[in-house]
Amino acid sequence: MSATGPFSIGERVQLTDAKGRRYTMSLTPGAEFHTHRGSIAHDAVIGLEQGSVVKSSNGALFLVLRPLLVDYVMSMPRGPQVIYPKDAAQIVHEGDIFPGARVLEAGAGSGALTLSLLRAVGPAGQVISYEQRADHAEHARRNVSGCYGQPPDNWRLVVSDLADSELPDGSVDRAVLDMLAPWEVLDAVSRLLVAGGVLMVYVATVTQLSRIVEALRAKQCWTEPRAWETLQRGWNVVGLAVRPQHSMRGHTAFLVATRRLAPGAVAPAPLGRKREGRDG
């Protein structure tokens, strides 16, 4: 997606009406975009700068901007459930996904998290996404390619079980698991992740949360896992009339963070809790 300059042919743009409703279209010469508030000629948008306002055939005004990554993710065609921006942002931050990083992703889904990972690692980094289901992999491929215009050079999509990965030992800096049974691939992840590397796990249920945390502890090659969830609530602000919105984005998932220990190292047991196999 372009970031600056006038809108050009073939580019995706976002129209926002007076009620805040958003529409996305790809600019094609001679085409028209139809809404319930009238049509908008693509030719009227091509060549404009971002932040311009156009008028529909019915006289309605629309703000024209390039869609942000969050806009694209929330409007792109879905197959599997997407990872919401509030969780993707924390995965990138808590997982310390840095420019140039080699990131392993298990569970490409619809490609929502993949896009955030690709943005974070930049052109010098690499994202390797494993997806067992061919239909999910195709959804991810279409959505990622739709955002970039083509499959990015620094993205590798593998339709296979991560447990069967033939990647070299210690070949990734960070790993992210978004799958039903992440505990089943911990042996593969511990082999592939560098010492000190961060593992982030995304799970939806309390049962999954308990099982993955206990599995990490049992392996005894990870730091003590941290687990949390995030609830997001918007606020309405009009002068001094400030109040929370009636609806909120509540539970979407639990996130778990841990780091790979050096071979043979044993982390100190957390105070206040005995660890089976370490403290007797």
From Swiss-Prot:
Catalytic reaction(s) noted: adenosine(58) in tRNA + S-adenosyl-L-methionine = N(1)-methyladenosine(58) in tRNA + S-adenosyl-L-homocysteine + H(+)
UniProt keyword annotations, A-Z: Methyltransferase, S-adenosyl-L-methionine, Transferase, tRNA processing
Enzyme class: transferase
Homology family: Belongs to the class I-like SAM-binding methyltransferase superfamily. TRM61 family.
Subunit and partners: Homotetramer composed of a dimer of dimers.
Domain of life: Bacteria
Primary role: Catalyzes the S-adenosyl-L-methionine-dependent formation of N(1)-methyladenine at position 58 (m1A58) in tRNA.
Activity control summary: Inhibited by Mg(2+).
Pfam families noted in UniProt: GCD14, TrmI-like_N
Species: Mycobacterium tuberculosis (strain ATCC 25618 / H37Rv)
Cellular-component GO terms for this entry: plasma membrane; tRNA (m1A) methyltransferase complex
Protein name, per record: tRNA (adenine(58)-N(1))-methyltransferase TrmI
GO molecular function: tRNA (adenine(58)-N1)-methyltransferase activity
Enzyme Commission number(s): 2.1.1.220
PANTHER family on file: TRNA (ADENINE(58)-N(1))-METHYLTRANSFERASE, TRNA (ADENINE(58)-N(1))-METHYLTRANSFERASE, MITOCHONDRIAL
Keyword Methyltransferase: yes
Domain notes per entry: Contains a large catalytic C-terminal domain that binds S-adenosyl-L-methionine and a smaller N-terminal domain that may play a role in tRNA recognition. Domains are connected by a linker region.
GO BP annotations listed: tRNA methylation; tRNA processing
Binding site for S-adenosyl-L-methionine: 110-113, 131, 136, 161, 178
